[in-house]
Amino acid sequence: MSMTGSSAYYVAHAIPPFLRLSNKTMLLLSTPPTTFFPTSTTPRVTLLSSTSSSSSSSISLRSSTAPSPSCSSVTPKDNCLASAKHSPPNMSASVSSRTFLNAQSEQDVFAGIKKEVEAGSLPANVAAGMEEVYNNYKKAVIQSGDPKANEIVLSNMIALLDRVFLDVTDPFVFQPHHKAKREPFDYYVFGQNYIRPLVDFKNAYVGNMPLFIEMEEKLKQGHNIILMSNHQTEADPAIISLLLETRLPYIAENLTYVAGDRVITDPLSKPFSIGRNLICVYSKKHMLDDPALVEMKRTANIRALKEMAMLLRNGSQLVWIAPSGGRDRPDAQTREWVPAPFDISSVDNMRRLVEHSGPPGHVYPLAILCHDIMPPPLKVEKEIGEKRIICFHGAGISVAPAISFSETTATCENPEKAKEVFSKALYNSVTEQYNVLKSAIQGKKGFEASTPVVTLSQPWK
């Protein structure tokens, strides 16, 4: 329900040399508006305790210990692409129907779905997806052990189904650079509240919190920060924000993500994407799915790169990138999850983009472990509407010190070797951090999994 990784496209000669990326260029998940300091009116999200209440569309949300992860799947039956060609940009997502907001019970929710299908205003395949998501989300949240699980599920699912139905009737159109929609409905808070009860915060960790604080200081100085990261689930953006929001709310709210077309077209994903800052591109893994659309996709991706370049020139930008080109998958033989290899050209393209932007830039390797919460299909699928699995589980993120291209490649004999060495250094750091998170969360070692390289903490406490 949130972002995916990478895009491939050829760049026209009109693009400046430093923007001429190879046909393996990845998805860039990118950064906030130009002002660093939030105003007093900017909504804030903090981790809610079991006695606190949430703003926006959801009730109090929290995590609690569960005996074991609870997983349930949802498979939208058909392609869920919503046509938006007749909709003006950014006009949707502002009003609401009362079909779901008036619901007082689970029975009312399902009756509302049936009513809209019979009225011809809700496609049957989307309705089926709604019902399955409700049931599977409910199972996962109940497994968390929260005594108010049913209340949480009803509140959050009413909010989600209302937004999905609104988008089906009036599709939201994403611009190449999409800024998170925070009013009149706060989609960011909505997404945080929806994913929060799926995270076992007792078994969640942040690695090297002082480095995240260091990044915020550099942003204040006008520097650009690039996070080269592995990518695990559609929920990655929410997981990152949830683990940082208590201590570093600005970073949590202002990361910008380069999103593939799938998460800005699937009705069940779009409400979560609307709440994030995005650079919208076409994924390289799906670039050739329809030969007739290849040129259009490449042109759109060039526009997205120009938007990225403009953002970086402003400085104080925080960019999250998945240079693997997509989500991690388990090894076919061992079934173990490991970070997918980084695409060398993707890493180098982003490095050059940052170097030519003007303000100082820093590249940090970041690891994320959260695949149990919303694991992807075992293989890449062409059709929109993948099978989704929803679980209650621990999660973690970790960042290592920035890696300098010039220092890392000082002894390299040629540019191609330098690209390879730099990409490998980033990937190796991500893998090392990932293994620490894995030991802490899945190996149940907790803080004892900390190493001289990765110090684990729980900054929400």
UniProtKB/Swiss-Prot annotation:
The keyword Transmembrane is annotated on this UniProt entry: no
Record-level GO BP terms: CDP-diacylglycerol biosynthetic process; phosphatidylglycerol biosynthetic process
Transit peptide start and end: 1-96
InterPro entries registered for this protein in UniProt: G3P_O-acylTrfase_chlp, G3P_O-acylTrfase_N, GPAT_N_sf, Plipid/glycerol_acylTrfase
Top-level taxon of the source organism: Eukaryota
Motif (HXXXXD motif): 231-236
Gene3D superfamilies: Glycerol-3-phosphate (1)-acyltransferase (3.40.1130.10), Glycerol-3-phosphate acyltransferase, alpha helical bundle, N-terminal (1.10.1200.50)
Record GO terms (molecular function): glycerol-3-phosphate O-acyltransferase activity
Reactions catalysed: sn-glycerol 3-phosphate + an acyl-CoA = a 1-acyl-sn-glycero-3-phosphate + CoA
Subcellular location: Plastid, Chloroplast stroma
Pathway in which this enzyme or protein is active: Phospholipid metabolism; CDP-diacylglycerol biosynthesis; CDP-diacylglycerol from sn-glycerol 3-phosphate: step 1/3
Top enzyme category: transferase
Ranges for region Disordered: 47-88
Record keywords, A-Z: Acyltransferase, Chloroplast, Lipid biosynthesis, Lipid metabolism, Phospholipid biosynthesis, Phospholipid metabolism, Plastid, Transferase, Transit peptide
Amino acid composition bias (Low complexity), ranges on this chain: 47-76
Domain notes: The HXXXXD motif is essential for acyltransferase activity and may constitute the binding site for the phosphate moiety of the glycerol-3-phosphate.
This protein's name: Glycerol-3-phosphate acyltransferase, chloroplastic
